From Swiss-Prot:
<keyword id="KW-0378">Hydrolase</keyword>
<dbReference type="GO" id="GO:0097216">
    <property type="term" value="F:guanosine tetraphosphate binding"/>
</dbReference>
<dbReference type="GO" id="GO:0043022">
    <property type="term" value="F:ribosome binding"/>
</dbReference>
<dbReference type="InterPro" id="IPR038363">
    <property type="entry name" value="LepA_C_sf"/>
</dbReference>
<dbReference type="Pfam" id="PF06421">
    <property type="entry name" value="LepA_C"/>
</dbReference>
<feature type="binding site">
    <location>
        <begin position="136"/>
        <end position="139"/>
    </location>
    <ligand>
        <name>GTP</name>
    </ligand>
</feature>
<dbReference type="InterPro" id="IPR004161">
    <property type="entry name" value="EFTu-like_2"/>
</dbReference>
<dbReference type="GO" id="GO:0003924">
    <property type="term" value="F:GTPase activity"/>
</dbReference>
<dbReference type="InterPro" id="IPR000640">
    <property type="entry name" value="EFG_V-like"/>
</dbReference>
<dbReference type="InterPro" id="IPR035654">
    <property type="entry name" value="LepA_IV"/>
</dbReference>
<dbReference type="GO" id="GO:0045727">
    <property type="term" value="P:positive regulation of translation"/>
</dbReference>
<dbReference type="GO" id="GO:0005886">
    <property type="term" value="C:plasma membrane"/>
</dbReference>
<dbReference type="GO" id="GO:0005525">
    <property type="term" value="F:GTP binding"/>
</dbReference>
<dbReference type="InterPro" id="IPR006297">
    <property type="entry name" value="EF-4"/>
</dbReference>
<keyword id="KW-1003">Cell membrane</keyword>
<keyword id="KW-0342">GTP-binding</keyword>
<keyword id="KW-0547">Nucleotide-binding</keyword>
């Protein structure tokens, strides 16, 4: 296949909220440009993971190269990079945008603009991309294109009066959209003769090939068999295979400046080609690496432990392979008295955490226990040193703490006026402080400062229920703020269970302690002796309940006779139970650890 001239290449991605029809539009592009035969087409071609197809969301960014014949008679090479729409995967979006010159802003004509789309669109504009507004789902009876155009102009602030109207489901307007795209989005720039600079947008591990990297060539030309160098590690490899996805893997002889494609260089080390790194030639290397992506900081932390302790090694390998494919996942070894050895993992949000756990269980056949998620707290010790704690059991003694500061997030919410009251009530309940309220044409834009610990747990779900699914949310960490926080310990039979400890606000500690002990009472199986469940702040017990003992009727064999005979048997039973209580261990089921998560949802 001959290398196409740079002026006929267009690199673009699609910005859209969940359910606005992004993956369906991608399917139409592939169909129209003949990327796959009719027999090979299936709905959501690019959502390759089972989880993506089941949940109807895009998690990983995918890339496709298509050939499009325009009305002007020229063939254009369209490199399309699909992006996720959920707030937890926003870092995937910024990586995709770094490889493009333009973006299609797809808005559902019936639903209008969502908060998430606004945030991603600003990222694209900041990176200097040309943004092309597109109205999708115009075939729906409730579609209101005029209102959607007004919202794009009011909320995002870009011209949208000539936005292209399409119905991805029916294929209407898709050809016109591609024609417009070829004209509006500029071709890539970069000298094919310069020293090679290729940005790694994504990497994944293939058990046969090793590390496969998705790259955007910014300058120079990469040929098959070239000796290439990964700039951050300084290690050299040979480019065994290069090519692009149509969406099938298609080998090529070279990728020159402006192209997007994959490289297989026989890298067996999982961390051999980190995302955001630069590839260059080993002999004529580029002077400096390309600016990568800003490192994403995990927001939610939880302990993951294998149920079977023999699975610790396979679990570690699985995490390493997943980390290659998911740059935002962070992990470090951790041991718990209750759960044994495992890892403390950092995620971007609750959906990210669920997806990671589900991928580990499905793709690597592991059985895992998750502890309650927490956020990272800033602690000023009395000696003046600053600590960051993301695990409640690592919190210093109350006497050594000068001040605990919790992370505060700025949440931007877009909601129809009808549900404004319910959403404000929810924000107040979550200890939110209103910063801004703005009435737009058909929606209200609200800005709140809410503690991150409240946002990451169940705020998104609660917001959706409060607004019947109409509200949309975008949040980002802003700063740390001093708060009256305490560590809530759970004691079972007088023993602290480290995996059940949580950090809560003092005002909520009593209610939370009572709810937790009640919930655990239902989940811990009854023993031959009474099991006390207590919630404590430091040495002070704030709630207590107990699991009653199973009772064996030892006096059943006594018919009539002396009362002292019965008393003797009862005393003997009592002494046995007391002895049992001292040595007896209580097995805590997996549901009990999850109870900590669920108390908040009710």
């Amino acid at each position: 296949m001959t290398t196409i001239s740079q002026k006929f290449i267009r690199n673009f991605s699609i910005i859209a909220h969940i359910d606005h029809g992004k993956s369906t539009l991608a399917d139409r592009f592939i169909q129209l440009c003949g990327g796959l035969s009719e027999r090979e087409m299936k709905a959501q071609v690019l959502d390759s993971m089972d989880i993506e197809r089941e949940r109807g969301i895009t998690i990983k960014a995918q890339s496709v190269t298509l050939n499009f014949k325009s009305q002007d008679g020229h063939f254009y090479q369209l490199n399309f990079i699909d992006t996720p729409g959920h707030v937890d995967f926003s870092y995937e979006v910024s990586r995709s945008l770094a490889a493009c010159e333009g973006a299609l802003l797809v808005v559902d004509a019936a639903q209008g603009v969502e908060a998430q789309t606004v945030a991603t669109c600003y990222t694209a504009i900041e990176q200097g991309l040309v943004v092309l507004p597109v109205l999708n789902k115009i075939d729906l009876p409730q579609a209101d294109p005029e209102r959607a155009i007004q919202e794009i102009e009011d909320v995002i602030g870009i011209e949208a009066h000539d936005a292209i109207r399409v119905s991805a489901k029916e294929g209407r307007g898709v050809k016109e959209l591609l024609e417009q795209l070829v004209v509006a989005i500029p071709p890539p720039v970069g000298d094919p003769e310069a020293p090679l600079q290729a940005l790694i947008i994504d990497s994944w591990f293939d058990s046969y090939l090793g590390v496969v990297s998705l790259v955007r060539v910014k300058a120079g030309t990469l040929r098959k068999g070239d000796k290439i160098r990964v700039m951050s590690t300084g290690k050299d490899y040979y480019a065994d295979q290069i090519g692009h996805f149509t969406p099938k893997r298609q080998p090529l002889e070279e990728l020159s400046a402006g192209a997007v494609g994959f490289v297989v260089a026989g890298i067996k080390d999982i961390f051999g080609a980190p995302v955001g790194d630069t590839l260059t030639h080993a002999k004529q290397s580029a002077g400096s690496p390309l600016p990568g992506f800003k490192q994403v900081k995990p927001q939610v932390f939880a302990g993951l432990f294998p149920i079977n302790s023999e699975e610790y090694e396979p679990f570690r390998e699985a995490l390493a392979k997943l980390r290659l494919n998911d740059a935002a996942l962070f992990y470090e070894p951790e041991s718990s008295e209750a759960l044994g050895f495992g890892f403390r993992c950092g995620f971007l949000g609750m959906l990210h955490m669920e997806i990671v756990q589900e991928r580990l269980e499905r793709e690597y056949n592991l059985e895992l226990i998750t502890t309650a998620p927490t956020v990272s707290y800033e602690i000023l010790a009395k000696q003046g040193e600053m600590l960051y704690v993301d695990n409640p059991s690592h919190l210093p003694e109350p006497g050594k703490i000068g001040e605990i500061r919790e992370p505060i997030a700025v949440a931007n919410i877009l909601v129809p006026p009808t549900y404004l009251g319910a959403v404000i009530t929810l924000c107040v309940e979550k200890r939110g402080v209103q910063k801004k309220l703005l009435y737009l044409s058909n929606q209200v834009s609200m800005t709140y400062e809410i503690p991150l610990s409240e946002v990451v747990l169940d705020f998104f779900d609660r917001l959706k229920s409060a607004s019947r699914g109409y509200a949309s949310l975008d949040y980002s960490f802003n700063h740390f703020q001093a708060a009256d926080l305490v560590k809530l310990d759970i004691l079972i039979s007088g023993q602290k269970v480290d995996a059940l400890a949580t950090i809560v606000h003092r005002d909520l500690a009593y209610t939370r302690g009572r709810e937790l002990t009640e919930r655990l009472k239902d989940l811990i199986p009854r023993q031959m002796f009474e099991v006390a469940i207590q919630a404590a702040i430091g040495a002070k017990i704030i709630a207590r309940t107990s699991v009653k003992a199973l009772r064996k009727n030892v006096t059943a064999k006594c018919y009539g006779g002396d009362i002292t005979r019965k008393r003797k048997l009862l005393e003997k039973q009592k002494a046995g139970k007391k002895r049992m209580k001292q040595v007896g261990k209580v097995a805590i089921p997996q549901e009990a650890f999850l109870a900590v998560l669920r108390v908040k949802n009710e």
